[in-house]
Amino acid sequence: MNLYEAVYARKSVRCFAKEAVSGKIIESIRKFYQEMEGLFGGIETELVILENRKEKRSFMGFASVKAPYYLALYTSNQEKCMMNAGYVMQQLALYLCSRGLGSCFVGMNVLRPRLRKRGDKILACLLAFGKSKGSYTRKPVDARRQDLKELCIFKEKPRLWMTQLLEAARLAPSSMNSQPWRFVVYDNRIHVFSRKYKAKSGQLGRGTELNFGILFSNMMVVAEELWLDVDLIRLDEMNQKKYPNSQYVLSVILRA
């Protein structure tokens, strides 16, 4: 299985065996992270792999999902850092799936407060992982997701590649399965919106921003597999408009 196949097959796993993951695979996770690119340049991240097979580690706080291992991703605290972190961590989640391991995004309270910072970096997200007690994959039809017709407004008939990108987006995991995204679809571009929340700043909340990073990770993996030259751009003309029930995030545009 490669990352593209994992986009459609991966499911969140919450029950793990206490078996050890081989040192070779742990090292391959580090190497994959070191070689990958983030969504935005200039945002520093750091990945820490935490082992918890004996469940007596001093780093543990309250954990609703108990796993033998956790990936902790730290980031410099700057604009779009959470979206970038979501993008990076979803790439790692897909990689773990491709190596036969289950994973699940979990809350910050898994780690004790003293470990939620690392130098000048803040903890952005956590991923529980290990060998799954059951299946770590599922068919796309079994995913509990809204249909594309509920998520999209089609301004033009989409090409096949556009439909594949949208399906990858539809299958993206999100906190509490909130699926906050909405899409306005044209022949060669997708304008991505968030459901509007009551934020005084007019900015996406950090959790929502993380969700969109996960979404864009799925879309870019599929774009690369299909050899599509795609840009993620924030268009000024879209950003300046007022939308009563949604908030503009980014546009996915196919280069000519």
Located regions from the model:
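Acidic, surface-exposed loops and disordered segments
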Residues: 1-256
